[in-house]
């Protein structure tokens, strides 16, 4: 696998809503009313129910894992939840290689990662460190 600074990794995209949120909640036992009920979301000051922040973090993991395949592994992932995702939004996860350090048996790759909505507004910017096998 060839990796260079500036490489953009293939985008991971999902349309958000109750179906995705319910599956995520079932796996993580996260049935929080603000994520499942529009009235609860409105009571919290939002337009309605909204997606879990950790689901966006999972989308970031997906985009990097899809890019790495069996050629490497994620060793660190961090992000900040700056905006919510709402029902019907198209959320895409992106990544760009920021640095590559050659080591004896592998490459240590630093990526800038982020989720954004269909209008290009960043929802969860972050960073990721991955090891890429030679």
Label each region the model flagged.
Residues 76-82:
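Short structured motifs
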Residues 46, 50, 82-90:
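Charge-rich, low-complexity amphipathic helices
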Residues 40, 76, 104-105:
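Sparse recognition of residues in long alpha-helices and their boundaries
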Residues 1-73:
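Hot-dog-fold acyl-thioester-processing enzymes
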Residues 1-10, 85-134:
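HotDog/MaoC-like acyl-thioester-processing domains
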């Amino acid at each position: 696998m060839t990796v260079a600074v500036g490489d953009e990794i293939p985008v991971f995209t999902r349309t958000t809503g109750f179906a995705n949120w319910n599956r995520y909640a079932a796996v993580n036992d996260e049935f929080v009313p603000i994520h499942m009920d529009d009235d609860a979301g409105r009571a919290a000051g939002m337009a309605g129910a909204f997606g879990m922040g950790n689901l966006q973090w999972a989308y970031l993991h997906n985009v990097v894992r899809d890019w790495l395949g069996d050629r490497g592994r994620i060793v660190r992932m961090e992000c900040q939840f700056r905006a919510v995702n709402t029902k019907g939004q198209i959320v895409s996860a992106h990544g760009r290689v920021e640095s590559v350090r050659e080591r004896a048996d592998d490459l240590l790759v630093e990526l800038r990662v982020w989720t954004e909505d269909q209008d290009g507004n960043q929802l969860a910017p972050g960073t990721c460190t991955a090891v890429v096998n030679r």
